[in-house]
Amino acid sequence: MVKSSKELLAKDESKVLAELQKNSKESIDTIAKHCGFSRQKVWRIIKHLEDNKIIWGYIAIADEEQNGLKHFVLLVKRNSVSFDTSVKKELILEKLDDYLPGVARIEDIFFTHGSFDAVVTFYVADIISAKKLVQEIYKRVGKYLGEYLLLETLFPVRKKGLKNPQIKGLVEYL
């Protein structure tokens, strides 16, 4: 049975996407070789993925401790008060980084289903700065939020799907 062209395109896109997620710095020639496609086909697929916002961007994964930053995870529960439209826009469209400019760099924000309603991961210099960021968040939108849990990351085993290249030296901490 012949598959439709849409099914084939989706399968080809997923192959290219998987290669980009392994290492987005690879050349189009290398990606094409790994996928078994022509260079032009890979270029067209990547362009299509970018145009349709399936690929949001490309990032470099760095050891932020080298820059004097520590990684924190903030788990937040909502309370029963409904969000105002302006607060929704502030949380989704604006940057939480602006709450403490030059102090905090927000990595990820997820709205979740489960014990907590949101997860915010960020980098700051120390626990005091992390607590200041939490205080600033609660100062601005605290009436909509319940309890929170602040966690400091000791070290990443994997980051963005890639294994930490220094993991062998960190095994003793497990």
Locate predicted features.
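A compositional/biophysical signature of low hydrophobicity enriched in polar/charged and small residues
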Residues: 1-174
